[in-house]
Amino acid sequence: MLLAIEQGNTNTMFAIHDGNEWIAQWRAATESTRTADEYVVWLSQLLSMQGLGFRAIDACIISSVVPQSIFNLRNLSRRYFNVEPLVIGENAKLGVDVRIDKPSEAGADRLVNAVGAHMVYPGPLIVIDSGTATTFDIVAADGAFEGGIIAPGINLSMQALHEAAAKLPRIAIQRPANGRIVGTDTVSAMQSGVFWGYIALIEGLVARIKAERAQPMTVVATGGVASLFEGATDSIDHFDSDLTIRGLLEIHRRNTHLETQ
């Protein structure tokens, strides 16, 4: 079975694929100092709940945007599963043509998303990933990664609003309950500013990208808060929560195929 680890700045996802389907997915808060021993204490309990032991894992792939965590995740795979992991950006061959000025700067998560999106949707594509940062990435019709846009994430914006303005409370991010744009109290005004502000960001950047490239493009959204925008904009064609793990599975398949040639 394959253990796929996808680590963002906020959360780390662990997923198990049995060769046919994903049978388990778990999330933990990303902590860059968490050791392999700490990971395995947590993970062993979850594996046990699925009726699985360490020996069931015979492959591992890691994608992380937190460089200081990769050492411990690699040790987790080596020490406890006796598996040399594929690591995006190190020893994993992605099969993606990276057409940007500095290919080494392309984030692992963005390249994995490009692979996952190209497998399912007709290109060219705009892939929006709503996480700690909100990224808009361009995937050509042939699957190449052609750059994109990086903006602050919605949670980061809300946090900055609270921390920088003494009288503004910390609130949950949600669509304003009354459905209106203009808030009538502080909380609804903040919710409207962040929620509809991000809708405007999405709609504006998607329109500008399409105009600059002068071609029809399919827009796919993924990430932790992407579902929040469902039904609020016509600029997104597909919401796909499995985009990243689909990309990881395909990259693992490509590398396994290369090893057997």
Swiss-Prot record:
Described purpose of this protein according to its UniProt entry: Catalyzes the phosphorylation of pantothenate (Pan), the first step in CoA biosynthesis.
GO biological process, one term: coenzyme A biosynthetic process
Cofactor: NH4(+); K(+)
The protein's Enzyme Commission number: 2.7.1.33
GO MF term list: ATP binding; metal ion binding; pantothenate kinase activity
Top-level taxonomy: Bacteria, Pseudomonadati, Pseudomonadota, Alphaproteobacteria, Caulobacterales
Protein's UniProt name: Type III pantothenate kinase
InterPro entries associated with the record: ATPase_NBD, Type_III_PanK
Native organism: Caulobacter sp. (strain K31)
This protein's encoding gene: coaX
